[in-house]
């Protein structure tokens, strides 16, 4: 039972489960004389146990959908349809009985309503802010409940693993193009459009298609693929973190806010020195963002009026950063010319050849 229920406010519990190598780790069954589906057994150390699911709990909702009047098979189908993560709203027998006596329908909204009432209570301002921070953290946790990488472990069958790998020209990485029905890949939870992060514990970030295929083949008849779906991939990119096996059940990173990203970029811009040599400047502008490219297009108009001088001691780094190709070649030519040895006087040449 939750702390609130013990304090006299009976509430259901929301359990977020991530499927492990052996499934979720709980058994569902119906009881004679009772309506609904119940948790019969929770395996030790399983995702179900970690989520707080208890034997004897009655299942009320699956991913926000009420299942109280559904058959055993219908509930099982809903859980399977969620693939590798599921959200279960449950009540223990005591809480269930209390809510029935009060005539309160059991819904996930009960938890949200309780959080709101705690947040709007009129104790001291510091306590209110603390409750608000906890509420925000819990909400953020629920939103990120399914945004984790997945470890898909599979053994090769008679027809292989049963998935196709491909690369997408529009984005880096290797992706799952298709998963064969009833294949080891499907049984492991692998899905089409998943991006491969690790193969058998080795990071595949930045690797070519052939490297990933070789890494899978090197595993023999078994492969462990750490993958992310599209939403999870975008979440980790916002956090500027590469997904790893630590994120399977460990703490998740926090996304960067726009202000933090802008601050980070501006700091990098101040720290990075501008090269005075033409080649590095041009190479850097080729990988710059759109605004720098627009500045580079305007730069010839600014430089046409003033001819570059080889005797100038130093030039503005910003102007060097945006110089045109023609100006860069001219400066390079002048720099080479300035390093040539001075011409020898003709009389000295004549004297030298006479001595020889």
From Swiss-Prot:
It is found in: Cytoplasm; Apical cell membrane; Cell projection, Filopodium; Cell projection, Ruffle. Residues 113-142, 265-356 are annotated as: Disordered. One of its GO terms (molecular function) is channel activator activity. Keywords: Acetylation, Cell membrane, Cell projection, Cytoplasm, Membrane, Phosphoprotein, Repeat, Wnt signaling pathway. The modification Phosphothreonine is found at residue 290. GO terms for biological process: actin cytoskeleton organization; adenylate cyclase-activating dopamine receptor signaling pathway; auditory receptor cell stereocilium organization; bile acid secretion; cerebrospinal fluid circulation; cilium organization; establishment of epithelial cell apical/basal polarity; establishment of Golgi localization. InterPro entries: EBP50_C, NHER, NHERF-1/NHERF-2, PDZ, PDZ_sf. It holds the Pfam family EBP50_C. Residues 272-288, 307-317 have a biased composition (Low complexity). The keyword Coiled coil does not apply. Scaffold protein that connects plasma membrane proteins with members of the ezrin/moesin/radixin family and thereby helps to link them to the actin cytoskeleton and to regulate their surface expression. Necessary for recycling of internalized ADRB2. Was first known to play a role in the regulation of the activity and subcellular location of SLC9A3. Necessary for cAMP-mediated phosphorylation and inhibition of SLC9A3. Involved in sperm capacitation. May participate in the regulation of the chloride and bicarbonate homeostasis in spermatozoa. May enhance Wnt signaling. Homodimer, and heterodimer with NHERF2. Binds the N-termini of EZR, RDX and MSN. Binds the C-termini of PDGFRA, PDGFRB, ADRB2, NOS2 and CFTR. Binds ARHGAP17, EPI64, RACK1, OPRK1, GNAQ, CTNNB1 and PLCB3. Binds PDZK1. Interacts with CLCN3. Binds the C-terminus of PAG1. In resting T-cells, part of a PAG1-NHERF1-MSN complex which is disrupted upon TCR activation. Forms a complex with CFTR and SLC4A7. Forms a complex with SLC4A7 and ATP6V1B1. Interacts with TRPC4 (via the PDZ-binding domain). Directly interacts with HTR4. This is Na(+)/H(+) exchange regulatory cofactor NHE-RF1. It comes from Rattus norvegicus (Rat). The gene is Nherf1.
